[in-house]
C-alpha cells in the first residue's frame, strides 16, 4: 500500500493572508494591530521594551531581527534559571507565555486584515478528505499531513470537508495527541482511534509547533481544542475539569496556556502533548512511500525536523 505524507510550512498559508516568519514582527508593530485591546497593548509594549532594553536593538532594526535571536536568549535563561536585564527566570517564563500569545494574535490579525483567497486550501482539504475516507471501505491508512504552522485555516477546512461529506459514522480531524473539547457538549472533537474503532475515519494533522486553537492546563495536562469560532488568545480561561474535580476557583495553577513552539534553537519538546505529536510524526514519516513538501524551507532553527527526516 502506498502512503503519502504532506509536509506544510508557512508558505502554504501565505496566499491566504498568512505570515512567513520575517513578517511577524512587522505585523506586531502595525499601528492597527492592538485595536485598543489592553492585553495586546501591554504585550506589545513589553515586546518592544525587551528588544530595546534587554537585547539593545535599535528601533530602525526591529523588523530585521530574527525571531530565533529573541527567543533563544529567553529560553537559555529559563532553562538555566538565570535573569536577563529586568527579568528574573520566573519573570521570563511569564514574558514568554505573553509573547506566545502575541505571536498567535499577529498571525490571526494578518488573516483578518488581508482576507485573501483561500479556495486552494479548501480544495486541498477536500482532496485529503477524499483519500482519508477510503479507510471506511478497506481499512487502509493512505495519507497524513504534518505542518509547522500555528494557524487553523487548514484545520477548519478539513473539518468542513468532513462535515460536507456527511459521513454516517464518527469522523474527525486527528491531532494525534490527547485532546478535550473546549465546549463540554461538543461531540465532534474525539480521538482519532475512537473514530476508526467506530468504523469511521480520521484525518491525521500533526502540528509540530503547536496550534492557535490548542490550550493546555498546566495541572492535568489536558489540551483543549476548538473549531469554527475564534478564541481570544489573550483572554484568561481555566480548566473546567480541574474546577469540577478539585473544586478549584479561577487560579493560575489551572489557567489554560497557549501551546505554541516559537522559533528558537532551544525548543522545549518535553510537553507531553507535543511529545506525542512528534512521536506520531516520526511513525507517519517512516511509513510513507512519498513525502510532499509544500511551502516549507527547512530553516536552520528547525534542526530537530532534520533529525526527524533522517
What are these regions (language model features)?
Residues 14, 21, 214, 262-263, ...:
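Generic structural "secondary-structure junction" signal
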Residues 33-36, 232-237, 295:
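Short, surface-exposed, polar/charged, turn-prone segments marking secondary-structure boundaries
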Residues 4-7, 46-219, 272-288, 293-294, ...:
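Active-site periphery "cap/insert" segments of enzyme catalytic domains
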Residues 29-30, 34, 230, 303-310:
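Charge-rich, low-complexity amphipathic helices
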Residues 21-30, 162-163, 223-229:
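Amphipathic alpha-helical scaffolding segments
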Residues 1-39:
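An N-terminal structural lobe/cap that precedes and organizes the functional/catalytic core
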Residues 207-266, 270:
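Cys/His-rich short segments
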Residues 40, 44-45:
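A short, N-terminal amphipathic alpha-helix
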Amino acid at each position: 500500500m502506498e502512503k503519502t505524507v504532506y509536509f506544510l510550512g508557512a508558505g502554504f498559508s501565505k496566499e491566504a493572508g498568512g505570515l512567513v516568519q520575517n513578517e511577524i514582527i512587522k505585523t506586531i508593530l502595525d499601528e492597527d494591530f492592538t485595536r485598543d485591546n489592553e492585553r495586546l497593548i501591554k504585550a506589545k509594549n513589553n515586546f518592544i521594551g525587551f528588544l530595546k532594553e534587554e537585547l539593545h536593538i535599535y528601533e530602525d532594526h526591529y523588523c530585521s531581527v530574527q525571531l530565533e535571536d529573541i527567543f533563544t536568549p529567553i529560553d537559555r535563561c529559563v532553562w538555566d534559571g538565570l535573569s536577563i536585564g529586568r527579568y528574573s527566570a520566573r519573570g521570563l517564563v511569564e514574558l514568554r507565555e505573553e509573547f506566545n500569545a502575541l505571536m498567535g494574535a499577529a498571525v490571526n490579525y494578518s488573516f483578518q486584515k488581508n482576507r485573501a483567497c483561500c479556495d486552494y486550501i479548501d480544495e486541498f482539504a477536500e482532496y485529503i478528505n477524499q483519500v482519508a475516507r477510503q479507510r471506511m471501505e478497506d481499512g487502509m491508512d493512505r495519507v497524513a499531513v504534518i505542518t509547522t504552522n500555528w494557524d487553523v485555516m487548514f484545520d477548519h477546512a478539513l473539518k468542513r470537508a468532513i462535515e460536507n461529506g456527511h459521513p454516517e459514522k464518527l469522523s474527525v480531524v486527528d491531532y494525534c495527541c490527547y485532546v478535550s473539547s473546549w465546549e463540554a457538549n461538543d461531540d465532534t472533537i474525539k480521538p482519532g482511534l475512537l473514530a476508526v474503532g467506530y468504523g469511521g475515519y480520521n484525518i491525521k494533522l500533526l502540528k509540530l509547533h503547536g496550534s492557535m486553537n490548542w490550550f493546555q492546563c498546566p495541572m492535568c495536562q489536558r489540551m483543549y481544542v476548538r473549531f469554527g469560532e475564534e478564541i481570544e488568545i489573550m483572554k484568561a480561561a481555566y480548566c473546567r475539569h480541574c474546577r469540577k474535580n478539585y473544586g478549584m476557583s479561577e487560579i493560575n495553577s489551572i489557567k489554560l496556556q497557549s501551546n505554541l513552539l516559537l522559533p528558537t534553537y532551544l525548543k522545549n519538546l518535553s510537553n507531553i502533548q507535543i511529545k506525542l505529536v512528534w512521536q506520531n510524526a516520526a511513525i507517519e514519516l517512516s511509513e510513507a512511500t512519498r513525502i510532499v513538501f509544500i511551502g516549507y524551507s527547512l530553516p536552520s532553527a528547525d534542526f530537530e525536523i532534520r533529525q526527524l527526516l533522517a
